[in-house]
Amino acid sequence: PDIDQISENLPKIRQTLFFSATLNKEILNIGKRFVINPKLIEVSPPSSTSNTINQYIIKCNNKNKLNTLENILSNIETKNTVIFCNRKKDIGSLYTDLKRRNISSIMFHGDLLQSKRQEALNEFKNGNNKILIASDVAGRGIDIDNISHVINFDVPINPEDYVHRIGRTGRAG
């Protein structure tokens, strides 16, 4: 392969650095072949999800997202469900759309006054409202037991946000 050719044309005494977003066996073997006394440095541990959580993906276009969400909500036993949106303005839009469809929910995001956020959390924790629509930033600050479902209305921008979002459920194992 190309890497063999490149390596043959390099000086024998050199510093060689490999960088990879993912480290699978193939990448590690390449490192062992071309680097003397390799050192592995990981910037952060890989994020992973709990095996106690059942995860599903439902593909739909933007035009059908709301209908799909309504269908999901009508077909699951909604105990405590958190719906995540990527932007605060989308939380308000989704709240309004669900209200028009007679689906009760509450909003939870950083622009709400602290008293309103606490009120929303209390309403959710007490079971007075079973659907909480949240942003990632606000969602990081919540600690609620017995969340039955997490719905990503918007695909998270980074994988860490996905892991954090679904980590809201499945804590008890």
Stretches with model-predicted labels:
Residues 1-173:
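Conserved helicase RecA-like core
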